[in-house]
Amino acid sequence: MLYLVGFLLATVCLLVLGVNVWVLIDHFLTIDVPPSIPHPVKFRILHFCFHLTTTWGHILEKMNICSMPQFFCFLQDSLSSKENHGVFVKDLRFGTIPVRLFRPKAASSKPRRGILFFHGGGAMIGSLDSHHNLCTFLARETDSVLVSVGYRKLPYYHHPSLYHDCINASIHFLKSLKAYGIDPSRVVICGESIGGAAAVVVTQTLLSRTDIPKIRAQVLIYPILQAFYFQSPSHLMHKNIPFLTKDFMITCICKYLAIDFSWKDAMLTGACISPSAWKKYEKWLSPDNIPKRFRTTYQPPESPAPFNEAAYLETKHAMNIDISPLVADDKIIAQLPEAFLVSLHWDIIRDDVLLYKKRLEDQGVPVTWHHVEDGFHGCILLFDKKLFSFPCSLNIVNAVVSYIKDL
């Protein structure tokens, strides 16, 4: 019996060691670190940890122990140290939606600015806890009342749960500003990654509402703005750069939109875009709209691949504006409030931010653009991680704070 137990333990240890060594060789040693990103060893370590977590998550998912997103979020939240220095924090519910309120402890002689915040994570990972310190920092440094929304996400919830939660929480918040001591003329909506997409969709959706205060400004931190066109320079040139690679991005999109993975290649090559849709969207998505310095080594594809009608029918909902707000009509874009856009040079979705910037500017919407040459997707969450922080992390949070304080 003891021999059997020892054999099983040895087998498990060898399995763990084998998986860890495989991830080390496959990711830590082979990754190409972009030249302008400082601390390449630190970057490799983070990349290794990210893929080690997702690999073990997939293994546990195959064993029916827990899903990959659950495992990732468990580790992410367990390792998150929550700091509340100078800020009162309280967990609440807006109906059934969990939210977290951040309010500066210092007294204020007048109503404060309000911030609605939506966290990132590709609808798979990320939580109120993972973004807690970022929200604390923003609330304290801008002297604002901030509400972070804990929307529903994978593995149990698919589109449109995320956006329904964000919209309903926003309406509840905007109707309750007086209770939180907020100036209704100074409400900012802010989001990171897919949370940035949520911020755009919420702002667009609430434009026609006359019973709630208008959003003062949008703060969009490398937002994911569309989910059907993957042929731009950054999508092709930065497809393997952490922490949002082509494979992880399309996995998140397919799972969230309940699209079968068999259509992945059709989506990535553009075969799912109908000729009529491309005729409408080309003027907004063309690489010609992107500044030349971002496409110097870009080799454009021969437009989208030959049209696949079956793929189109299975994926066409990815073009809806509640998923791809980048392609909303001009009459909607023209009504939007001013925006602060953060783009990252080494981000696969960099060009979507640049295209949205042009769309806003073409319709006369004031835009403040903050481009980070050494930035990579997700870097803002490292701003307080000391040993694992990067210059770009503090660069972004300080720029966001400066912009919000001037509103």
UniProtKB/Swiss-Prot annotation:
Compartments where located: Membrane
Glycosylation sites: N168
Signal peptide annotation: none
Cytoplasmic compartment residues: 1-4
Active site: S193, D347, H377
Sequence ranges on the Lumenal membrane side: 26-407
Enzyme Commission identifier(s): 3.1.1.-
Pfam families from the UniProt entry: Abhydrolase_3
Main subcellular location: membrane
Residue stretches spanning the membrane: 5-25
Family label: Belongs to the 'GDXG' lipolytic enzyme family.
Name this polypeptide is given: Arylacetamide deacetylase-like 4 family member 1
Species the sequence originates in: Mus musculus (Mouse)
Lineage: Eukaryota, Metazoa, Chordata, Craniata, Vertebrata
